[in-house]
Amino acid sequence: MAGREKRRRVAALDGEERRRRQEEAATLLHRIRGLVRWVVAEVAAGRSPTVALHRYQNYCSSASAAAASPCACSYDVPVGTDVLSLLHRGSHASRLNVLLRVLLVVQQLLQQNKHCSKRDIYYMYPSIFQEQAVVDRAINDICVLFKCSRHNLNVVPVAKGLVMGWIRFLEGEKEVYCVTNVNAAFSIPVSIEAIKDVVSVADYILIVEKETVFQRLANDKFCERNRCIVITGRGYPDIPTRRFLRYLVEQLHLPVYCLVDADPYGFDILATYKFGSLQLAYDANFLRVPDIRWLGVFTSDFEDYRLPDCCLLHLSSEDRRKAEGILSRCYLHREAPQWRLELEAMLQKGVKFEIEALSACSISFLSEEYIPKKIKQGRHI
């Protein structure tokens, strides 16, 4: 009886959530139609319609940031405004023209309750858009203009992330039961809105930078011996991976650890999870995981675990430029001074190495020694 009552409550909540999303979609569609009608009326009257777009910036790389002085960067407050005019010549007119064309596609998607990818939109007007980045910017502009996220526009990416471990959930009507084989990889859902009934007995979430490391842990049956959820974004994480991680953190309230290569690009991937990306600054506060813990690998691990010299690689000039650029970001001075010190040590020593270098100790050293002991002993920053 209690079980049936619980299922009824869950069904009622799912129904309420469905209605809320339908109302949000209807409201957004109404606002889009209103803007399009206004633009058409302005042009018909011989006037130049203008659209004001807030400009967001979640971090900067200025000299003042390096001096640890205050800057205007914020996760939820705009730092400026761009005014786009359709009839003026120049880049702003082109930008507004592209925005309106993409907006018409979005309007059609919402009216017909259909979805498409950014690439689909590009191929609708390739001679006008010229390159994919133009469409990407227009989608970001629309999100800023209507204060919504990309998924609200029915523009969906192709998810590349993977998950395994002690978790099960429903994705629409599909059951995703990772717990039946905790070492098997499952694709991360494209739409977080389709997820419901999440259940987990995990103690923590582990993010690994690369699929090769993810597969190493799967082969070593890491999740059988450690009650956890393992996720990889397979390099720089896409939006579905970041949204999925943020969703799990909010639902399960578990600590999150991140394992990346000891190089500037690994550090940048780690920073993307914690602080968000500059391209999606307007949405960073809803995608980032501010309490993520850096588990490794650290430059100091090379000496601590007595790895052979052949595992070390010298930082290239490109690596150095990347590291110096990251070091100037204001959030490292403001929110993660220990992370900054670790990156400075890497730059000072001029070396880097990959997670897989730990296999020099033994093939399963990463899964049997490095990760479990570091988490148990609290050796993370």
Swiss-Prot record:
Listed cofactors: Mg(2+)
Q: Which InterPro entries match?
A: Meiotic_Spo11 (IPR013048), Spo11/TopoVI_A (IPR002815), Spo11/TopoVI_A_N (IPR013049), Spo11/TopoVI_A_sf (IPR036078), TOPRIM_Topo6A/Spo11 (IPR034136), WH-like_DNA-bd_sf (IPR036388)
Tell me yes or no: is Nucleus among this UniProt entry's keywords. yes
Which amino acids does the record list as binding Mg(2+)? 209, 261
> The organism sits in which domain of life?
Eukaryota
One GO cellular component, as annotated = nuclear chromosome
Query: Is Kinase among this UniProt entry's keywords?
Result: no
- Please write the reaction equations for the catalytic activity of this protein: ATP-dependent breakage, passage and rejoining of double-stranded DNA
EC number(s) per UniProt?
5.6.2.2
Q: Which residues form the active site?
A: 123
Q: What class of enzyme is it?
A: isomerase
Task: Give the Topo IIA-type catalytic domain ranges.
Answer: 23-162
Mind listing the GO molecular function terms for this protein?
A: ATP binding; DNA binding; DNA topoisomerase type II (double strand cut, ATP-hydrolyzing) activity; metal ion binding
Keywords, sorted A to Z: DNA-binding, Isomerase, Magnesium, Metal-binding, Nucleus, Topoisomerase
A Gene Ontology annotation in the biological process aspect, one of them, is:
reciprocal meiotic recombination
Where it sits in the cell: the answer is: Nucleus
Q: What else is known?
A: Plants silencing TPO6A1 have no apparent growth defects during vegetative development, but most of the plant are completely sterile due to empty and shrunken mature pollen grains, and defect in the macrospores.
**Can you tell me which family this protein belongs to?**
Belongs to the TOP6A family.
Role: Required for meiotic recombination. Mediates DNA cleavage that forms the double-strand breaks (DSB) that initiate meiotic recombination. Is essential for both homologous chromosomes pairing and crossover formation during meiosis.
Protein name per UniProt: Meiotic recombination protein SPO11-1
Q: Which organism is it from?
A: Oryza sativa subsp. japonica
The record's gene field reads: SPO11-1
